[in-house]
Amino acid sequence: MAIIKCKPTSAGRRHVVKVVNTDLHKGKPFAGLLAKKSKSGGRNNTGRITVRHVGGGHKQHYRIIDFKRIKDGIPAKVERLEYDPNRTANIALVLYADGERRYILAAKGMQAGDKIQSGIDAEIKVGNALPLRNIPVGSVVHAVEMKPGKGAQIARSAGTYVQVVARDGEYATLRLRSGEMRKVPVDCRATMGEVGNAEHMLRQLGKAGAKRWRGVRPTVRGVAMNPIDHPHGGGEGRTSGGRHPVSPWGVPTKGYKTRSNKRTDKYIVRRRNKK
């Protein structure tokens, strides 16, 4: 994997930093694992904007990823690594011994030809998926379930991982990258190793158009709006907003806690680190 800093041959190239992975498949994705993905433009069924800064962008197919890893006892071989426009991580196309193909997240160090497996009898090695009760304390894992059988929800982005720090009774304690310590049932599955493509964070798009290709629209400052559009809007001439920063709906935007899921508070042993 190479990091390329473009020469300033134009204003649009001056700040571009690319991450080039020569191991990725250059052809089309596996057609049997593609699904239609339609654009919403950030609108809901009534046509109102519910998510700002969304719209446009290149057409995409959704890749159906196996986040459950429940084909126990059937060995599989990694056929190739592929780019996925729907996530920061790369994905791997695996061929099981029974002839079925599936996409999974590509772990760090995974290559074409690697053998992987899932289940309680799987070996402790990168790419294998096991229940947390069978994973040694201190191990680094990714794609962790929060409920048994629901599918992976934690540590799915490029370069992320979770460490198993303890196991007590029916719960395992995990340390997340944010610093949060969280309890998860030991029957939840996780995949050994880190998510690959950690260099993703080093890339620089370099120009506004590269954001538009990805379906991201501009962000307008509140102080540049009218009073009807934002609490910071209006005023004669340039203003600083006149109050502590808030969202367009008046919610404080710097350091204000908005978590309200009391049902799962008991599973959080320690809150995440302050930025």
UniProtKB/Swiss-Prot annotation:
Pfam families, alphabetized: Ribosomal_L2 (PF00181), Ribosomal_L2_C (PF03947)
GO BP annotation list: cytoplasmic translation
Keyword annotations: Ribonucleoprotein, Ribosomal protein, RNA-binding, rRNA-binding
A molecular function GO annotation: structural constituent of ribosome
Stretches the record annotates as Disordered: 223-275
NCBIfam families: rplB_bact
Function: One of the primary rRNA binding proteins. Required for association of the 30S and 50S subunits to form the 70S ribosome, for tRNA binding and peptide bond formation. It has been suggested to have peptidyltransferase activity; this is somewhat controversial. Makes several contacts with the 16S rRNA in the 70S ribosome.
Species in which this protein is naturally found: Shewanella woodyi (strain ATCC 51908 / MS32)
Signal peptide boundaries: none
Protein name, as recorded: Large ribosomal subunit protein uL2
Classification via InterPro entries: NA-bd_OB-fold, Rib_uL2_dom2, Ribosomal_uL2, Ribosomal_uL2_bac/org-type, Ribosomal_uL2_C, Ribosomal_uL2_CS, Ribosomal_uL2_dom3, Ribosomal_uL2_RNA-bd_dom
GO cellular component: large ribosomal subunit
Subunit structure: Part of the 50S ribosomal subunit. Forms a bridge to the 30S subunit in the 70S ribosome.
UniProt keyword Membrane present: no
Similarity annotation: Belongs to the universal ribosomal protein uL2 family.
